[in-house]
A protein has these predicted regions:
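Glycine-rich acyl-CoA binding loop
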Residues: 122-127
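Acetyl-CoA-dependent GNAT
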Residues: 6-30, 34-40, 45-119, 130-132, ...
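Conserved GNAT acetyl-CoA-binding A-motif
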Residues: 137-149
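Conserved binding-pocket/active-site segment within a compact domain
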Residues: 118-121, 157
Length: 157
Protein backbone atom coordinates (compact mmCIF):
# COMPACT_ATOMS: atom_id res chain seq x y z
CA UNK A 1 0.00 0.00 0.00
CA UNK A 2 1.37 3.38 -0.88
CA UNK A 3 2.19 5.86 1.88
CA UNK A 4 -0.29 8.34 0.38
CA UNK A 5 -3.13 5.82 0.44
CA UNK A 6 -2.25 4.79 4.00
CA UNK A 7 -2.34 8.42 5.12
CA UNK A 8 -5.75 9.03 3.55
CA UNK A 9 -7.14 5.89 5.20
CA UNK A 10 -5.70 7.00 8.53
CA UNK A 11 -7.24 10.47 8.22
CA UNK A 12 -10.63 9.05 7.24
CA UNK A 13 -10.68 6.65 10.20
CA UNK A 14 -9.63 9.42 12.57
CA UNK A 15 -12.61 11.57 11.72
CA UNK A 16 -15.14 9.03 10.47
CA UNK A 17 -18.02 8.06 12.73
CA UNK A 18 -19.78 5.29 10.87
CA UNK A 19 -22.86 3.21 11.45
CA UNK A 20 -22.37 -0.34 12.63
CA UNK A 21 -22.96 -2.58 9.58
CA UNK A 22 -24.36 -5.37 11.78
CA UNK A 23 -27.62 -5.31 13.69
CA UNK A 24 -27.43 -7.55 16.73
CA UNK A 25 -30.62 -8.70 18.50
CA UNK A 26 -31.67 -6.88 21.69
CA UNK A 27 -30.87 -10.06 23.65
CA UNK A 28 -27.20 -9.90 22.57
CA UNK A 29 -25.23 -9.24 25.79
CA UNK A 30 -22.83 -6.70 24.25
CA UNK A 31 -23.12 -3.17 22.95
CA UNK A 32 -21.45 -3.10 19.53
CA UNK A 33 -19.97 0.01 17.97
CA UNK A 34 -17.56 1.01 15.24
CA UNK A 35 -14.27 1.96 16.86
CA UNK A 36 -12.06 4.83 15.75
CA UNK A 37 -8.50 5.79 16.60
CA UNK A 38 -9.84 7.69 19.61
CA UNK A 39 -10.55 4.21 21.05
CA UNK A 40 -6.91 3.17 20.62
CA UNK A 41 -6.06 3.31 24.37
CA UNK A 42 -8.89 0.88 25.21
CA UNK A 43 -7.95 -1.47 22.38
CA UNK A 44 -4.28 -1.33 23.36
CA UNK A 45 -5.22 -2.17 26.96
CA UNK A 46 -7.25 -5.18 25.80
CA UNK A 47 -4.30 -6.32 23.66
CA UNK A 48 -1.88 -5.99 26.60
CA UNK A 49 -3.88 -8.73 28.32
CA UNK A 50 -3.09 -11.15 25.48
CA UNK A 51 0.73 -11.34 25.40
CA UNK A 52 0.79 -14.87 23.92
CA UNK A 53 -0.73 -13.62 20.69
CA UNK A 54 2.12 -11.15 20.19
CA UNK A 55 4.66 -13.75 21.25
CA UNK A 56 3.41 -15.99 18.42
CA UNK A 57 3.67 -13.06 16.03
CA UNK A 58 7.24 -12.58 17.26
CA UNK A 59 6.43 -8.90 17.40
CA UNK A 60 6.43 -6.59 20.42
CA UNK A 61 3.09 -5.01 21.24
CA UNK A 62 3.15 -1.24 20.76
CA UNK A 63 0.43 1.38 20.30
CA UNK A 64 1.67 1.79 16.70
CA UNK A 65 1.15 -1.91 16.03
CA UNK A 66 -2.40 -1.74 17.38
CA UNK A 67 -3.03 1.41 15.36
CA UNK A 68 -1.93 -0.42 12.22
CA UNK A 69 -4.78 -2.91 12.78
CA UNK A 70 -7.22 -0.01 12.46
CA UNK A 71 -5.86 0.97 9.05
CA UNK A 72 -4.53 -2.23 7.46
CA UNK A 73 -6.38 -3.27 4.32
CA UNK A 74 -6.03 -6.29 2.06
CA UNK A 75 -5.24 -5.76 -1.62
CA UNK A 76 -8.05 -4.21 -3.64
CA UNK A 77 -10.07 -3.03 -0.63
CA UNK A 78 -10.65 0.49 0.65
CA UNK A 79 -11.60 2.00 3.99
CA UNK A 80 -15.34 1.90 3.16
CA UNK A 81 -15.10 -1.93 3.19
CA UNK A 82 -13.51 -2.12 6.65
CA UNK A 83 -15.06 -1.87 10.09
CA UNK A 84 -13.19 -2.19 13.37
CA UNK A 85 -15.88 -3.17 15.89
CA UNK A 86 -15.84 -3.02 19.66
CA UNK A 87 -17.99 -5.27 21.83
CA UNK A 88 -18.62 -3.70 25.23
CA UNK A 89 -20.17 -5.10 28.37
CA UNK A 90 -20.84 -2.89 31.39
CA UNK A 91 -18.99 -0.04 29.62
CA UNK A 92 -15.84 -2.18 29.33
CA UNK A 93 -14.30 -3.30 26.06
CA UNK A 94 -14.79 -7.08 25.94
CA UNK A 95 -13.65 -7.84 22.39
CA UNK A 96 -12.57 -6.27 19.11
CA UNK A 97 -13.17 -7.48 15.58
CA UNK A 98 -11.76 -6.22 12.28
CA UNK A 99 -14.23 -6.94 9.46
CA UNK A 100 -13.50 -6.46 5.77
CA UNK A 101 -16.58 -6.89 3.58
CA UNK A 102 -16.22 -8.50 0.16
CA UNK A 103 -12.79 -10.02 0.67
CA UNK A 104 -11.41 -12.12 -0.90
CA UNK A 105 -14.63 -12.19 -2.96
CA UNK A 106 -18.02 -10.47 -2.83
CA UNK A 107 -19.69 -13.33 -0.92
CA UNK A 108 -17.11 -13.39 1.88
CA UNK A 109 -16.45 -11.27 4.95
CA UNK A 110 -12.89 -11.47 6.26
CA UNK A 111 -12.08 -11.14 9.96
CA UNK A 112 -8.47 -10.02 9.97
CA UNK A 113 -8.23 -9.49 13.72
CA UNK A 114 -10.37 -10.78 16.57
CA UNK A 115 -9.41 -10.57 20.22
CA UNK A 116 -11.34 -11.16 23.44
CA UNK A 117 -10.44 -9.66 26.81
CA UNK A 118 -8.33 -12.14 28.76
CA UNK A 119 -10.79 -12.24 31.67
CA UNK A 120 -13.56 -13.39 29.31
CA UNK A 121 -11.61 -16.08 27.46
CA UNK A 122 -12.61 -19.70 27.95
CA UNK A 123 -16.17 -18.71 28.85
CA UNK A 124 -17.75 -18.90 25.41
CA UNK A 125 -17.50 -15.16 24.76
CA UNK A 126 -15.57 -15.43 21.51
CA UNK A 127 -17.78 -18.25 20.24
CA UNK A 128 -20.91 -16.25 21.07
CA UNK A 129 -19.65 -13.18 19.21
CA UNK A 130 -18.51 -15.19 16.18
CA UNK A 131 -21.74 -17.22 15.95
CA UNK A 132 -23.97 -14.13 16.20
CA UNK A 133 -21.82 -12.32 13.64
CA UNK A 134 -22.04 -15.30 11.26
CA UNK A 135 -25.84 -15.42 11.62
CA UNK A 136 -26.17 -11.71 10.85
CA UNK A 137 -23.83 -11.91 7.86
CA UNK A 138 -25.75 -14.87 6.48
CA UNK A 139 -28.98 -12.84 6.67
CA UNK A 140 -27.14 -10.11 4.73
CA UNK A 141 -26.51 -12.68 1.95
CA UNK A 142 -22.85 -13.31 2.69
CA UNK A 143 -22.02 -16.97 2.22
CA UNK A 144 -18.63 -17.19 3.90
CA UNK A 145 -16.80 -15.71 6.84
CA UNK A 146 -13.02 -16.20 6.98
CA UNK A 147 -11.21 -15.76 10.27
CA UNK A 148 -7.47 -15.12 10.22
CA UNK A 149 -5.48 -16.75 13.00
CA UNK A 150 -1.85 -17.23 13.90
CA UNK A 151 -0.76 -20.82 13.35
CA UNK A 152 0.52 -22.38 16.55
CA UNK A 153 -1.40 -19.99 18.80
CA UNK A 154 -3.41 -22.39 21.00
CA UNK A 155 -5.63 -19.54 22.23
CA UNK A 156 -7.09 -19.07 18.76
CA UNK A 157 -7.78 -22.72 17.98
Amino acid sequence: MSETHFSSVKRKILRDVRQNPLTFPPSFPFTVSVLTLSDLPSVYSLCLGNPLYYKHLNCPLTPDLVQSDFTALPPGKNCEDKYFLGFCKNSSLAAVMDLVFGYPDEKTVYIGFFMVDRQLQGKGTGSLIISHTADILQRQSYRFMKLAWVEGNRQSE
